[in-house]
């Protein structure tokens, strides 16, 4: 069976561990050269905790550290480092006494020429996610950065990805579900949507919903599997069912192969068709 292209599973602890590991690598690299280094591209995003594995093109090595220089004459061949020229000025800041980095907005723009649209959306969704420990920027800040720097390699792909980005998502897995839904011609999914529960006279927030079709998609990550969260999810979904909504949880297995995703969306599509035809769901 064909494996799905994106390995995007992470926990907050894993994100912190990757950021710390990358920081140590950057410090070691900086101490071995007299050249001033400004870390950028995917390295900058990893320093901020992005563990999503993107589909990079062959001319980008994700196993190397990436740095940016402001002049082509400063390009060099450092060991285990890929050096890039960026002709739009370097939006540089220091994250400690030794390590200089570009802004997250610049790093996002820089990777656009090296990834596909889906990967770019995942990176943008991550950078603007709802988690206060991981959120790095907003769509408004990214748009303002675009206005300031003008054209750059990959800008068309970047603009398309930005139009598909949804701020305040909860995980890259939700991004994948949303993108796969678009590919299949299904309606627009609303992210983090409030749903009114008449029996409880309150609202609950769901990951994603086809608003007019009463079909909900939710990703059940590892943190859903402690007993309290598991019981809370069951209660929430029972209440949503009573309110006339049908919920389709996705798990790690859903993303394991393209065949699994195809089957998942066949079921989702059938539920949408059923609601449109009858105004309800069969049990």
Each PLM stretch: what is its role?
Residues 1, 131-283:
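Surface segments flanking catalytic/ligand-binding clefts of nucleic-acid enzymes
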